[in-house]
Amino acid sequence: MDPTLYCVVAVDTKLGIGKNRCLPWPALRGDMRRFRQLTTDCAPGKQNMVVMGRRTWLSIPAGCRPLAGRINVVLSRTLETPPPGAHFLASSLDAALGLARSPELAQQIDKVWVIGGGNLYREALTGPWPVRLFLTRVLHDFACDVFLSHDSLAAYARVNPKPGEQERVFQERGIFYMFETYIKVTQSSDTALPDLERPRPATPPFSETS
């Protein structure tokens, strides 16, 4: 199993990720396509695990649960059995990672993806493991009531596009957005990166005034 923890999230200009327990903006096909591609891409003969909180699970339309082609794990400290459709229940992110490393699943899983919500993102982004963060930046303010914390992103730097690739702003339904990738910056992870992916500082994308 890949030791890196992968996170995928969409944020508005103030790092908002939710409003009234729903996605704050209309569904963006390009973002949904990228989410599906990221979380399903895996080594032959394996699957990825997607880990989410109970509210995130319930926010997925019933007809789309579980997320197809992925091992769905729901986190809850109050439930005693997995919610209908979920494959596994875990009490914490650590417990979910332990499940992924268990004899039952270790040979089946390629990557572990964290897909929400806010508290789980914070735990994932500030934990001791290597992290790669795939972020959709929605270039509008949607007056959200759930946010990614700036503190949890302080250790992250943006990965430069590869030669020949160009940052692109997409537009759907009058909404502009773009895709970005970040890594947790440590001495070992920074020096291990090839020059073409040398990270750049996370500011201004994660600044208080963004």
Curated annotation (Swiss-Prot):
Q: Which organism is it from?
A: Human herpesvirus 8 type P (isolate GK18)
Q: What is this protein called?
A: Putative Dihydrofolate reductase
Which lineage ranks, top first, belong to the organism behind this chain?
A: Viruses, Duplodnaviria, Heunggongvirae, Peploviricota, Herviviricetes
- Which reaction(s) does its UniProt entry say it catalyses? (6S)-5,6,7,8-tetrahydrofolate + NADP(+) = 7,8-dihydrofolate + NADPH + H(+)
Q: Carries keyword Ribosomal protein? A: no
Which family, according to UniProt?
Answer: Belongs to the dihydrofolate reductase family.
Which residues does the UniProt record annotate as the domain DHFR? 4-184
Record EC number: 1.5.1.3
Q: What class of enzyme is it?
A: oxidoreductase
